[in-house]
Structure formats: C-alpha cells, structure tokens
C-alpha cells in the first residue's frame, strides 16, 4: 500500500503504539477508525485528542470490524484470537502490527535494521549494540520496544546509518514483511503462552525475525532452539549462521577464551584465526547472561562491519538500565541486588546463577509458568526464600518438592507494603557474604504498576536498612 489517500484503516487499540499509528495514518490521508475494548476515563481522554484531529474512535467495542475496513493496524497487546481478527480473516482484510507499518513506510535508502528478540536480554542487548555502533561513529538509535519509536525513527527528520531494533514476539507475529540486515534470537523459554496459545506458536513467532536476513542470523550455541530457527529460516543467498557461546568458539562463532571476548566469524581464515574484541571486565555487570548479551550485540555489530576496537569501546561505555541486576547497597556485609526485570523463570534462573549464597525474594503473577526446573537448578545456591505476590504458592510448592531444606518465609499479602516486610525478612535470613536478590520470576501487576515500581520499592526498602 503506497497511496494511503482515502484508504479505510482500522487501528486496534489505544496506547503507546496505537495512538501514534493512528496519527501517522491520518497524516498520510487514510480514513482512520480506532477501536478499543476499554471505555474508561483515560481512554475517553485519548479518544478526545484523536477526534479533535478528525479520527473516529469507537470505545467499548473492539470486536466488530468497521464497515469498509481495508487494513487493520493492531497494537502488540491484542491477541491473535480476538474476534476482530477472525472477522478480518473472513473478510480478507490484512492485519499489520506497528512494526510492519514502520517497515512498509521506510523511504528509499533507509537505514538497515539489526534486530534482536529473545525471551530475556532484548533491551540490554539492543542498548549494548547501539553503544557499539555509536563507538564506531555511526548514526544510530535503539528503537522498537525501547528508546525512539520505530515510526518516529522511520518518518522523523533525523537520519540514521543503522538502527538497533528490539522486537517482541507480539510484534513479530504481526510483521510478515520484515527483512532485517542481520538478527538474533538470544534465547527461548516459556513466556507469554497465554497470548500465543502454545510454546510452538511462541517459538515460531520469535523465529520470524530471521526471515529474509541478508548478512547474518546470530544464534545462541547453548540454546538449540535458536539454531533450529536459523536452519528453518528462508534467508537471502549468502546469509550466514553465526553462533555465540560462553565457551571457546568454533569457526563462525563468537565466544570467550581466558577472559577475552573473541570473534571467529568475521575474520579472514576463521578456521585458524580469531580476533580479540574486548575483555570480560569490559562488560557491565560481568554476569554470565550479560556476557552472552554482549557477544550477541558484538556479532550483530561485526556483521555490519564494525571494527573490533568499537566493540571494546562500546561495551566499556555501556551501563545497564535500572532494575537489571543492579547493585543497590551493601548492609552488614550483605549485598542487595535489584533484578526486578526478571519477570519470568528463564530470567530469574540467569540472575540466580550469577551469585553464590542467596536469599531470594520472589513472586508475583506467574503467567502460567512452572517453577520446578528453576528451583531444582538453583536449590544449592539458596540460603533462604521470601515469597510475595498473588501466585507465590506455586513457588512455595516447587520449593517443597526440590529444596525442602531451604527456609521459606511466605508473606500473605499483595499490597505494596509487602516489599519493606520482605526486605526485613530477607535481612533476618542473610549472613555476611550473602546476596539478597530480588529476581521475582513473575510479573508485577498484582502489586505494582510495573517492574520499575517494584524495583523502586525494593531499593527504597533496602536503603532504609542503613538509615
């Protein structure tokens, strides 16, 4: 669709991507109708702003396909089994996401995309990648789920040499035309299964990121599912499979040798040679899963032709966002770490693996997850556990099965005041040399607006210990 004038487009959902999409489409000359399930005060205020522009908004009815619709542009949160999409399929109306819209609106000579997805580590990897690209002197931005919106990056006045793009499984589901320069799936673990319907569907949507890649499909050697997705992808001729590993890399891989990040993929005679990129100490923090993120970012940057020195300089300059394995304080010889971003079992497992003797604060909304494997793998590291949140019983039961000797404090409350109580209980269980780790393995919305608020509450409670 290149001529938007007079096209009838329905935007499914208000919010951070729906509203910008509606504005952009209206500006292109489309006849835009926004449909939204909710009809609350916030939705009505958003609707009023759009209606002032001449955009039609229909609140409280997101199920009915507006008459004459030629295209639906959906926000990522709308599940594929929504009645609206069934009606669209029956009527032969295509459905795009905001990523698909941005991809289709790119102009001639637009910046190529280096794309990142995975169950965990997406944001950190994209930010590392942007830091490396910047160190190489390239005009770039971290876009997608973070930083600049994709629509702004594609349509804005600022020009870029290359974009570092974070993509969720939701976004990839609705982006059939996306063709990245190079891409990576960092890891695959059960998450968002309520949205996708099955692990198979979730994995398949992640794998869409490799379709049509031109230069490199970067996979995790330790996660065979990611390599399987590369093998299944239909890519351009000459596109290479490149692995990253925390071990010694083979040919066409990046890895670690004696504390050095090395490249055996983007070098001459990769059967015999390796290029030093950076030291493990250049990665902040140097936890194993974060080193893996750095290797993936380095692989994408190297695929774009970035020199080794820029990888080193970019990693040295990078600092992670708050609530990602963030050091809060040391109190009475105990280290307090905020990893509130660990909202699923895979992320929590990586966080727990980075420390020795741990008092673990966990719980929240489980999103259908099982905790048996997580607890079984982490049991030997646990000094004690403090449970909070709506689904804490699921973790308690897994602890009873796989770590019955570990002391567990079950806080039977879901108000925000539970966090100071949890920190006090963790302090009581911990001894000098231990780490008190907030790695909830669950979503936060039962108690907090988001994981940031949860992490803030933890940090505030910890700082109160030293007062």
UniProtKB/Swiss-Prot annotation:
| One Gene Ontology cellular component | cytoplasm
Record InterPro entries: Folylpolyglutamate_synth_CS, Mur-like_cat_sf, Mur_ligase_C, Mur_ligase_C_dom_sf, Mur_ligase_cen, MurD
- Signal peptide feature range: none
**Keywords of the record:** ATP-binding, Cell cycle, Cell division, Cell shape, Cell wall biogenesis/degradation, Cytoplasm, Ligase, Nucleotide-binding, Peptidoglycan synthesis
- UniProt xrefs under Gene3D superfamilies: Mur ligase, C-terminal domain, Mur-like, catalytic domain, NAD(P)-binding Rossmann-like Domain
Report the locations given in the UniProt record.
Cytoplasm
Sorted alphabetically, the Gene Ontology BP terms of this entry are: cell division; cell wall organization; peptidoglycan biosynthetic process; regulation of cell shape
- Sequence positions that bind ATP: 118-124
Is Nucleotide-binding one of the keywords UniProt gives this record? yes
The record lists the catalysed reaction(s) as:
UDP-N-acetyl-alpha-D-muramoyl-L-alanine + D-glutamate + ATP = UDP-N-acetyl-alpha-D-muramoyl-L-alanyl-D-glutamate + ADP + phosphate + H(+)
Please give the chief subcellular localization of this protein: cytoplasm
Q: Name one Pfam family in it.
A: Mur_ligase_C
Here the disulfide bonds are: none
Per the UniProt record, which EC number(s) apply here? Answer: 6.3.2.9
Q: In which pathway does it act?
A: Cell wall biogenesis; peptidoglycan biosynthesis
Gene Ontology MF terms in the entry: ATP binding; tetrahydrofolylpolyglutamate synthase activity; UDP-N-acetylmuramoylalanine-D-glutamate ligase activity
> What does the function comment of this entry state?
Cell wall formation. Catalyzes the addition of glutamate to the nucleotide precursor UDP-N-acetylmuramoyl-L-alanine (UMA).
Instruction: Spell out the family assignment given in the record's similarity comment.
Output: Belongs to the MurCDEF family.
Q: What is this protein called?
A: UDP-N-acetylmuramoylalanine--D-glutamate ligase
Gene name in the database record? murD
